[in-house]
């Protein structure tokens, strides 16, 4: 069965606050049965949740981000949904929730995309369909203990790159610690992100045009890089000698998300013959980097043109779109859009006929 072409839609003026797709997918878990229900499609953007649910009151929730893109042959490719299934299972365990089984997670993602397939942007458009799986404690529970019921759902929306298509200016956060070493910074929960909003808004209003994004450092020494507020940190070093390969620098941090996009970049870099270096990266070491990128599902690959450290009055500057960034960006984009072969097996073709008769 043919996948429908994109709906009539003003893709370039899309407002992410609107949700006018056809609906979302829901699954429910009850402690009484110990099982998740089969996924069902709900033709509404709203959920029915008890007001005393731990997901609302105690932050017992986790989420993921995935993207789907349309190829020139009108196929739809979903990028690494299995990796998100594995990561969300780890996040759920961290906040005392039953993990969603791998196959149920992936099937629910395919269902949500298939039944909203006409909202996957055209192949030649610079956007994608953003897929948001989330899970939370949903039944009444006043005490600080697991509730009897949980909801897993998958929402989708047409999506334009989070930070646009230019370079970013970053400010190192010095008045706020995003996560502690033995805290929850390594899992994808809303509590890691909501407190950052006011600090991000404050940074945007600073003098000299403001800052696009915050860069967080470790809470203990305030010197080692964790990640950006919205994405992972990647540095590069150009080859110093003609026969030496360039390097990709990935900060080691127990308080940062294990980024799927960063992992993908590392695999691409390895296929180019570049060296991958995973080690702690200090603020001082920013001066030795050739390029810096912010990478994530919603952000994509975005070059960072400068990083500001106010307390030492230092600004680290980088190319707005260096050669290593351009090679990584083009290669990843071509794989995700079906323009080149996917030797890594990252893209899953949409199982459209399984859900649409």
UniProtKB/Swiss-Prot annotation:
Pathway: Mycotoxin biosynthesis; HC-toxin biosynthesis
A molecular-function term among this protein's GO annotations: branched-chain-amino-acid transaminase activity
UniProt enzyme class: transferase
Keyword Transferase: yes
Gene Ontology biological process: branched-chain amino acid metabolic process; toxin biosynthetic process
Family annotation (Pfam families): Aminotran_4 (PF01063)
Entry keyword annotation includes Nucleotide-binding: no
Binding annotation for pyridoxal 5'-phosphate: 87, 227
Highest rank taxon of the organism: Eukaryota
EC number from the UniProt entry: 2.6.1.-
Keywords: Aminotransferase, Pyridoxal phosphate, Transferase
N6-(pyridoxal phosphate)lysine PTM positions: 188
Cofactor: pyridoxal 5'-phosphate
Disruption phenotype: Does not affect growth and sporulation, but impairs the production of HC-toxin and related pathogenicity.
Note: The genes involved in HC-toxin biosynthesis, called collectively TOX2, are organized into a diffuse cluster that spans >500 kb. All of the known genes are duplicated or triplicated within this region, with some variation in copy number and chromosomal location among different race 1 strains.
Job of this protein: Aminotransferase, part of the diffuse TOX2 gene cluster that mediates the biosynthesis of the HC-toxin, cyclic tetrapeptide of structure cyclo(D-Pro-L-Ala-D-Ala-L-Aeo), where Aeo stands for 2-amino-9,10-epoxi-8-oxodecanoic acid. HC-toxin is a determinant of specificity and virulence in the interaction between the producing fungus and its host, maize. TOXF contributes to the synthesis of 2-amino-9,10-epoxi-8-oxodecanoic acid, an essential precursor for the production of the major forms of HC-toxin by the non-ribosomal peptide synthetase HTS1.
Family: Belongs to the class-IV pyridoxal-phosphate-dependent aminotransferase family.
Protein name: Aminotransferase TOXF
Originating organism: Cochliobolus carbonum (Maize leaf spot fungus)
Gene field: TOXF
